[in-house]
From Swiss-Prot:
Keyword line: Coiled coil, DNA-binding, Transcription, Transcription regulation
Pfam families named in the record: GreA_GreB (PF01272), GreA_GreB_N (PF03449)
Coiled coil, from the record: 47-73
Described purpose of this protein according to its UniProt entry: Necessary for efficient RNA polymerase transcription elongation past template-encoded arresting sites. The arresting sites in DNA have the property of trapping a certain fraction of elongating RNA polymerases that pass through, resulting in locked ternary complexes. Cleavage of the nascent transcript by cleavage factors such as GreA or GreB allows the resumption of elongation from the new 3'terminus. GreA releases sequences of 2 to 3 nucleotides.
Molecular-function GO term, any one: DNA binding
Protein name: Transcription elongation factor GreA
Superkingdom as given in the UniProt entry: Bacteria
Protein species of origin: Thermodesulfovibrio yellowstonii (strain ATCC 51303 / DSM 11347 / YP87)
UniProt lineage: Bacteria, Pseudomonadati, Nitrospirota, Thermodesulfovibrionia, Thermodesulfovibrionales
Family of the protein in this entry: Belongs to the GreA/GreB family.
Gene name for this UniProt entry: greA
GO BP terms: regulation of DNA-templated transcription elongation
Length: 158
């Protein structure tokens, strides 16, 4: 897995903060919880011990996952991108040609995507359709249930 993961500076920092929290706070706390549970005696019927070990396994797995993502991260500063076209990190305002409803999409890397907050992956159908387009251009996005027709009304990089 040598594929680079595009990421905004904010997304990179968010993952770093989570990793730091897991290593500096969560890991020591679970080690302490395991030691305390172990002190209660028979481990075969010690629910606290087994729960703590399970949580430790989850934490260690997440630490490894975050370390791998951060190692493969390619941080892209949107402010240094050609701002005439939709690109990674752009906030794109569109109008649905059929319903005249306005929407805003923030194009981010796959690990930062959060559809509920308008952050869509550049690898999603919407992201792929918008990349490289300019204000005034129209895009058609075919979804399983419906086809969307958007016109780009603004592009910004913040």
């Amino acid at each position: 897995m040598t594929d680079r993961i595009p990421m905004t500076p904010e997304g990179y920092e968010k993952l770093k903060e989570e990793l730091d929290r897991l290593i500096k706070i969560e890991r020591p706390a679970i080690i302490k919880a395991i030691a305390e549970a172990r002190a209660h005696g028979d481990l075969s019927e010690n629910a606290e011990y087994h729960a703590a070990r399970e949580k430790q396994s989850f934490i260690e797995g997440r630490i490894q996952e975050l370390q791998a993502k951060l190692a493969r991260a390619y941080v892209i500063d949107p402010s240094k991108i050609n701002q005439n076209k939709v690109a990674f990190g752009a906030k794109v305002r569109v109008i649905d040609i059929d319903t005249e409803e306005e929407k805003e999409f923030h194009l981010v890397g796959p690990d930062e995507a959060d559809v509920k907050n308008g952050k869509i992956s550049i690898t999603s159908p919407v992201g792929k359709a918008l990349i490289g387009k300019e204000v005034g251009e129209q895009v058609t996005i075919k979804a399983p249930a419906k086809t969307f027709n958007y016109e780009i009304i603004s592009i910004s990089f913040e």
